[in-house]
UniProtKB/Swiss-Prot annotation:
Gene: mmpL11
Originating organism: Mycobacterium leprae (strain TN)
Protein known as: Probable transport protein MmpL11
Primary site of residence: membrane
UniProt keyword annotations, A-Z: Cell membrane, Membrane, Transmembrane, Transmembrane helix, Transport
Topological category with respect to the lipid bilayer: Multi-pass membrane protein
Cellular localization per UniProt: Cell membrane
Statement: the UniProt record of this protein carries the keyword Cell membrane: yes
Length: 1014
């Protein structure tokens, strides 16, 4: 992955060009879809319904031709003339379409104003795509959206019905639903991403990848639909999973990139490290999702295979975009993606820091593993219990609201012809034992008559038409019109009865029952019989992928088991929401059965999606375990550091699914609800409760892997794909500091002063700085006292922070900042006043308790350094009679790694002490003593003494005399007499007390220097 990342960075403009070349034609294809998406595809290979369907197409052209119907439905004020004109209009429209003809219906009464009238149509070979013809007919009759067409006077409504019309209406509805869902999804996703990253540039990367994934996949789906059957529901599936997965995958990589930058890596190294960890996890996760979706092919029906194909394309494009476009984008816009907006206070915590809340939570559940596991398991089992009541069904018609024109048209046709006339049960009778005999021969007519009489005895059968014989006279066809709708459960019962009873009729006949009802029945039976096999296949795929990623038998088995619980809970939610109608008031349709396409899709998709979080979390835990060898510590660390990323990704996914659940048709809503519940359960009860508790219970068994299996598995290691960070002498902002908001004034001033320092000290050298953050802790000093000439405050070291000399724990008292001149008197204020970090946490804290940001501290250091260097130049130029303090060595600076990957040169803490001491020697002002006293508050007199006793190595005035500078500094610090101290300043008791404090602190440094010299 690192080599791939390196190539992608180097040739990023080629990557952008390639995706642009794929995006442009995809946009065209997505906007001008060919209309070949179908509402069918439910045929089952080898089933009776498919056999009957094929025989009708081959041997019964009048019965098996694909047809549509136009319906004229009168209003209560319509007349005979209105109906005649409407029917004439429909026939005139039909005549305008080549290859479309009317099928006479002798049983239908002439047009009347008290009942609808239907015009049945037949399409020849010139119109192979029925939905295209249906779209044109809908336009001709004036159908707009879900509103029916009307005649000129509005007294007769016009409809287009049939399989092609259903497909066209579903396609139109899908476009509308996708637009509505994205109107909800995109703002929600943007808000979540802004909350996570605190940067519009960072939030734009995953969002752009999501949109790109959906558009490219839509174009591919349109190309595939030209060569194979693709369901109209593919568009919703692609949009739903494409944007969710693309945003999630790029989110994982971008979060790791920011984390690596904050650990001290350069931007290019951070991109490679992110790809070697999160990028590899994305590849494994995407492959797991794709492998899980291939399980749907086991069902072997065109509708489900097409939806699986669309989902696989969406996952593949999302994965490909994430691992190619993301590193290219980060190499180009990485710095902008890392910078946090100063207006976004909610996202100030770093991605890689451990959350105190989640650390405590994991500790609590691991301390009570049996209670926690029992409670979580009980909740999941309760949610899964309704699965036993799940009823499977299938209906295109119920995908529309009751007010939709397609349902009104079907209802009008049922009123004109009868509810079962639109989908008769078709019984095909063959005589395989006597292939040379004609089906219409007298010896077989008696058997056919007996079968027809038996059909009339079936429940819900209104009439059975006389037998029709095939063109080759080898079979006979009987059509039964039912008294119920073909999609009604009663119609299914009738089909089941016929399949059981008709073969028992005496004779040598072979009976196959087909028709629309039998077709759906066969589809549902195939799903019910094949889903257990699919479950085993998907679970095995997930187990193998987890085994490769985690290299643990127990963790892989546990991951599969936990995902099964999530899927069961999702199935239970389907029953509660749709079958039982618990959320009907929120707009979810109350239906009698769950669409049979939903359970296998949800099973494959949720299994794959859950692997995202499983792999991401467990690889974090394993990485920590390999470092420490302690399971509980590894679990606490893994959960607390990844909880924010997992929660953010889950929120995005749930938002997408919920958006489609509310905006989509019932079938899409079912998928959205089930996936949203599965993800919500997975990231709460499973990842945050069951995973830590079970790992705490099994301790070292979590990591058991037989040696033979370890040798057999491919080597995919997440913890050693790239070299460790070599910081050398670079200062890296700690995560808890780098995540805080930098005061804008301090940031601008530091950058300005850094450039000025580079000009004043071009020969500066870089060294390590153990005092880089000394003075950034909480300020416990008084901030309301003003010195007679320079102000300072008492400081107390925070014992929790440790010694100031420790570079990692030296976040102690606050550093004093710049002073101001007011009415001729020097006044100094603590940096806390007006310069401290103000975020949502510290805003409610007293000024004296707020932490000091490093940039505020470094601004003070820069001020001292610039002041000293400018004073040195001024003394040499304007005061040749003063002592000539020569600099003996270059100015010492330190490299600071910023969160953006940029590096900044700052004066070291020791150099700042030397420079302020130089100012005391050459200028001897109140301000200089006050600044030194306040620096001593932060670093302790002993630490200052260690630095200042070596002052003669950096400055010299009397070359023959050794330690002259340090000796003179001790004299001045032991009894300060600044040149700008006046008698008027002693009149104020507060000023006098402040000056005594400064003298005392300076004296403590002088004493410490004498002790150090011994």
């Amino acid at each position: 992955m690192m080599r791939l990342s390196s190539y992608l960075r180097r040739f990023r403009w080629l990557v952008f060009t390639g995706w642009l070349l794929a995006l442009v034609p995809a946009i065209y294809l997505a906007m001008t879809q060919s209309g070949k998406l179908t509402g069918g595809g439910f045929e089952v290979a080898g089933s009776q319904s498919l056999l009957v369907h094929d025989q009708l197409q081959e041997q019964y052209p009048d019965q098996g031709a694909v047809s549509l119907a136009l319906v004229a439905a009168p209003r209560s004020d319509a007349s005979y003339q209105d109906m005649n004109d409407a029917v004439a209009l429909l026939r005139r429209i039909v005549s305008e379409f080549p290859g479309v003809s009317e099928v006479p219906n002798p049983t239908q009464l002439p047009p009347r104003p008290d009942r609808p009238y239907g015009v049945s149509l037949r399409l020849d070979d010139r119109n192979s795509v029925t939905s295209d013809v249906a779209k044109q007919l809908r336009t001709k009759v004036g159908i707009k959206g879900d509103q029916a067409g009307r005649t000129a006077n509005g007294k007769v409504r016009l409809y287009v019905i049939g399989q092609g019309a259903l497909s066209a209406a579903v396609a139109a509805n899908s476009k509308h639903d996708i637009a509505e869902a994205e109107r909800w999804n995109l703002p929600i996703i943007l808000i979540v991403l802004l909350a996570v990253f605190g940067s519009l540039a960072a939030a734009a990367v995953p969002l752009a990848l999501g949109v790109c994934t959906v558009v490219v996949t839509m174009g591919l789906v349109d190309l595939v639909s030209m060569h194979t059957i693709m369901s109209v529901f593919v568009t919703s599936t692609v949009s739903m999973f494409g944007i969710a997965l693309a945003v999630d995958y790029s989110l994982f990589i971008l979060m790791r990139f920011r984390e690596e930058l904050r650990s001290g890596r350069q931007p290019q190294e951070a991109v490679d490290a992110a790809m070697a960890t999160s990028g590899l996890a994305v590849v494994l996760s995407g492959m797991t999702v794709i492998a899980s979706l291939t399980g749907i092919y086991l069902i072997n029906t065109a509708a489900l295979k097409s939806m699986a194909t669309g989902a696989i394309l969406a996952v593949a494009i999302a994965m490909l975009a994430s691992i190619t476009l993301t590193p290219a984008a980060l190499a180009t816009f990485g710095r902008a993606a890392v910078k946090r907006s100063v207006l976004m206070h909610w996202s100030q915590r770093s991605e890689c820091t451990q959350s105190l809340f989640w650390t405590r939570w994991v500790g609590w559940v691991m301390h009570r593993p049996w209670i926690s596991a029992s409670a979580a398991s009980t909740i999941l089992i309760i949610m899964a219990t309704p699965v036993t009541s799940m009823m499977l069904g299938n209906s295109l018609l119920r995908q529309f609201n009751s007010s939709h024109e397609i349902r009104a048209g079907v209802a009008a046709a049922a009123q004109a012809l009868g509810p079962g006339a639109l989908g008769p049960v078709q019984v095909l009778i063959t005589f395989p034992d006597d292939p040379n005999t004609q089906a219409s021969s007298p010896k077989h007519r008696q058997t056919i008559g007996a079968i027809r009489n038996r059909m009339l005895q079936a429940k819900n059968v209104m009439s059975v038409a006389p037998p029709q014989f095939a063109d080759n006279n080898c079979s006979a066809l009987l059509g039964a019109v039912l008294s119920v709708d073909p999609e009604d459960l009663g119609a299914r019962e009738t089909v089941d009865w016929m399949r059981t009873e008709l073969p028992k009729v005496p004779g040598a006949a072979h009976v196959n029952v087909g028709g629309p009802t039998a077709l759906i029945n066969d589809f549902d039976d195939r799903v019910a019989k094949t889903e257990p096999l699919m479950l085993v296949f998907v679970a095995l795929i997930a187990f193998v992928m987890l085994l490769i990623s985690i290299r643990s038998v127990f963790l892989a088995f546990k991951g599969v088991l936990m995902t099964l619980l999530s899927v069961a809970a999702a199935y239970g939610s389907l029953v509660m929401v749709f079958q039982w109608g618990w959320l009907e008031n929120l707009g979810f349709t109350h239906i009698n059965s769950i669409d049979s396409t939903v359970p296998p899709l949800v099973l494959a998709m949720t299994f794959g999606l859950s692997m995202d979080y499983e792999i991401f979390l467990l690889t974090r835990i394993r990485e920590r375990f390999l470092q420490t060898g302690h399971t509980r510590d590894a679990v606490a660390y893994g959960v607390s550091t990844s909880a924010r990323t997992i929660t953010s990704a889950a929120l995005i996914m749930i938002a997408v699914f919920v958006g489609f659940a509310f905006a989509g048709m019932p079938l899409v809503a079912e998928i959205g609800v089930a996936c949203a519940v599965a993800i919500a359960v997975d990231v709460t009860a499973v990842r945050l409760v069951l995973v830590p508790t079970l790992m705490a219970m099994f301790a070292q068994w979590n990591w058991w892997l037989p040696r033979w299996l370890s040798r057999a598995l491919p080597a995919v290691d997440f913890d050693k794909p790239f070299p460790p960070v070599d910081l050398n002498e670079i200062v890296v902002l700690p995560a808890d500091i780098s995540a805080t908001k930098v005061p804008c004034g301090d940031l601008r001033m530091v950058l300005k002063l850094a450039a000025k320092l580079k000009n004043l000290a071009p020969d500066a050298i870089c060294v390590a700085d153990p005092l880089a953050f000394t003075g950034c802790g909480r300020n416990n000093k008084r901030s309301d006292r003003v010195l007679p000439g320079a102000a300072t405050q008492e400081s107390e070291e925070d014992p929790a922070m440790g010694k100031a000399s420790d570079s990692t724990a030296a976040l102690t008292a606050a550093q004093v900042g710049p002073v101001t001149r007011t009415n001729g008197h020097w006044t100094a204020r603590n940096l806390v006043i007006g310069l401290t970090h103000r975020n949502s946490i510290t805003r409610v804290m007293p000024w004296s308790d707020r932490p000091v940001h490093p940039f505020t501290l470094w601004r003070s250091r820069f001020s001292v350094a610039i002041d000293a260097l400018e004073a040195h130049i001024a003394v040499q130029a304007d005061a040749p009679d003063q002592p000539n303090y020569q600099r003996c060595s270059p100015v010492e600076t330190a490299h600071v790694q910023l969160p953006t990957g940029d590096r900044l040169l700052i004066p070291t803490g020791a150099e700042t002490l030397r420079l302020v001491s130089y100012l005391i020697m050459c200028r001897n002002s109140i301000r200089d003593y006050a600044e030194l006293a306040d620096m001593v508050d932060a670093i302790e007199p002993e630490t200052a003494a260690v630095v200042l006793t070596e002052l003669d190595r950096y400055y010299s005035c009397q070359l023959p005399m050794r330690q002259w500078m340090a000796t003179q500094l001790v004299r001045r610090l032991s009894d300060p007499h600044p040149v700008d101290l006046t008698e008027d300043q002693w009149s104020d008791p507060d000023n006098k007390a402040e000056w005594q404090d400064v003298r005392q602190r300076c004296l403590s440094v002088a004493v410490a220097m004498l002790e150090e010299a011994r």
